[in-house]
Curated annotation (Swiss-Prot):
Classification via SUPFAM superfamilies: HesB-like domain
Name of encoding gene: Isca1
Task of the protein: Involved in the maturation of mitochondrial 4Fe-4S proteins functioning late in the iron-sulfur cluster assembly pathway. Probably involved in the binding of an intermediate of Fe/S cluster assembly.
Native species: Rattus norvegicus (Rat)
GO biological processes: endocrine process; iron-sulfur cluster assembly
Pfam families in the record: Fe-S_biosyn
Transmembrane segments: none
A GO cellular component entry from the record: cytoplasm
NCBIfam families attached to this UniProt entry: iron-sulfur cluster assembly accessory protein
Entry protein name: Iron-sulfur cluster assembly 1 homolog, mitochondrial
Keywords: Iron, Iron-sulfur, Metal-binding, Mitochondrion, Transit peptide
Subunit structure as annotated in this protein's UniProt entry: Interacts with CRY2, but not with CRY1 (in vitro).
Top-level division of the source organism's lineage: Eukaryota
Amino acid sequence: MSASLVRATVRAVSKRKLQPTRAALTLTPSAVNKIKQLLKDKPEHVGLKVGVRTRGCNGLSYSLEYTKTKGDADEEVIQDGVRVFIEKKAQLTLLGTEMDYVEDKLSSEFVFNNPNIKGTCGCGESFNV
């Protein structure tokens, strides 16, 4: 059983140099710290699960949920002591993506800096590849 998490937006990244890595997703130090903080309050969960859903004005949207187990088809990313599981349906859309956590005076959210995105909606919540 999964529990819903926080809001996430996506940004199309142009001219981004891909870093050689075996992981489909890399995490910034800010994202790692926030995930550790979130999981500290949820000891029954082992990590976060990233999925992709069909919704929004541009077609696709990422979802983030707490998870207690790794699904059979999930790809596991372990970085700096945190575990992020990527649902099979989301794996190709996330290749080369950097997951960040951004805070400003009015909001805080996870942001997916994704070089595969062709377009996003005005609010940044949905995208197409």
